Amino acid sequence: MSETTDYGASNTGANEESLRMVSSQPIGNEPVSDEELRPHVLGGFIGQPRLKAQLQLFLDAARKRDVPPDHILLAGPPGLGKTTLAMIVANELEVPIRVTSGPAVQHAGDLASILSSLDVGEVLFIDEIHRLPRAAEELLYIAMEDFRVDVMVGKGPGASSIPLTLPRFTVIGATTREGMLPSPLRARFGFTAHLDFYPHEELEKLIERSANVLGVNLDTGSAHELALRSRGTPRIANRLLRRVRDWAIVHDLIVVRPDDVKEALALYQIDSEGLDRLDIAVLNAIVRNFNGGPVGLNNLAAMVGEESETVETVCEPYLVREGFMIRTPKGRVATELADIIFGNYAQR
């Protein structure tokens, strides 16, 4: 399986998020370093059992019919394995994969150039497909449905459109914002898969597999401690495992015990709930400085010394999902769970 990669630039929110150890966005050279941890077959992909069963049936049917499969949309939060699944699909089908992203496609012509160079059966993986320019989306509609692109020849009033037939190929789109995809584009995907956050048990299995690949000898319970801090996200789990590996190397540890995991990640201010410095600062401010809330976003951001957008888009989603905080029309309110953690039992 050959592969061509074109990674686009991240947006501002992603840049803020990427500064955190518990970010679900890639940090630094992670797209490259993660390659060694990626499974190459569907059977080696840990987690998402229902999705795997559906995808296996989908691919088996395409192989038996001896035709490229329908287009695939992979939707879900970042860091759950959408890119890995796209690579697995191409590998299972034994076809090349071309990789690009929505931000990397600046003009419709960029996408037309990629499409016109595809071979029969090739997979085109478009990460962040919801960020394609409108003109590129419209070109992709036709390419996915009719396997052709219309090439403009000439300029001005004399310009004409010449249809260029494309070989049958498969688009795999990945998105963290499925709702931002136009309905005509969504309708052209024959298979849509939704990835969910991982339960601790599945994350432990994934961590143990990654530890074997990286040569990290984890003691009983160590994978569990890592899973607790990984926010249900494989990308975060693998990142934290690498930092624990660094700790083990520096301290000449043959076996990494649970206490070693706790001590190593405490250095990065990550607690057993997966909360980091910013999360703790936000919750601490709501509970102690604002008596549990409600508090407005701007006041909360000023209290923790961050931009309002950073608090809202980078910090709050996890705190709300895990039940530490709720958003109300009057502002942010800490839950009983946050009150207990921060030792505040005052009645509101």
UniProtKB/Swiss-Prot annotation:
Positions of the UniProt region annotated as Large ATPase domain (RuvB-L): 4-198
Matching InterPro entries: AAA+_ATPase (IPR003593), AAA_lid_4 (IPR041445), DNA_helicase_Holl-junc_RuvB (IPR004605), P-loop_NTPase (IPR027417), RuvB-like_N (IPR008824), RuvB_C (IPR008823), WH-like_DNA-bd_sf (IPR036388), WH_DNA-bd_sf (IPR036390)
Pfam families: AAA_lid_4 (PF17864), RuvB_C (PF05491), RuvB_N (PF05496)
Record-listed ATP binding positions: L37, R38, G79, K82, T83, T84, E145, D146, F147, R188, Y198, R235
Region annotated Small ATPAse domain (RuvB-S), chain positions: 199-269
Residues annotated to bind DNA: R327, R332
A GO-annotated cellular component: Holliday junction resolvase complex
Binding site for Mg(2+): T83
Molecular function in Gene Ontology: ATP binding; ATP hydrolysis activity; four-way junction DNA binding; four-way junction helicase activity
Enzyme Commission code(s) on record: 3.6.4.-
Family stated for the protein in its record: Belongs to the RuvB family.
Function: The RuvA-RuvB-RuvC complex processes Holliday junction (HJ) DNA during genetic recombination and DNA repair, while the RuvA-RuvB complex plays an important role in the rescue of blocked DNA replication forks via replication fork reversal (RFR). RuvA specifically binds to HJ cruciform DNA, conferring on it an open structure. The RuvB hexamer acts as an ATP-dependent pump, pulling dsDNA into and through the RuvAB complex. RuvB forms 2 homohexamers on either side of HJ DNA bound by 1 or 2 RuvA tetramers; 4 subunits per hexamer contact DNA at a time.
Protein name from the UniProt record: Holliday junction branch migration complex subunit RuvB
Organism whose genome encodes this protein: Bifidobacterium longum (strain DJO10A)
Gene coding for it: ruvB
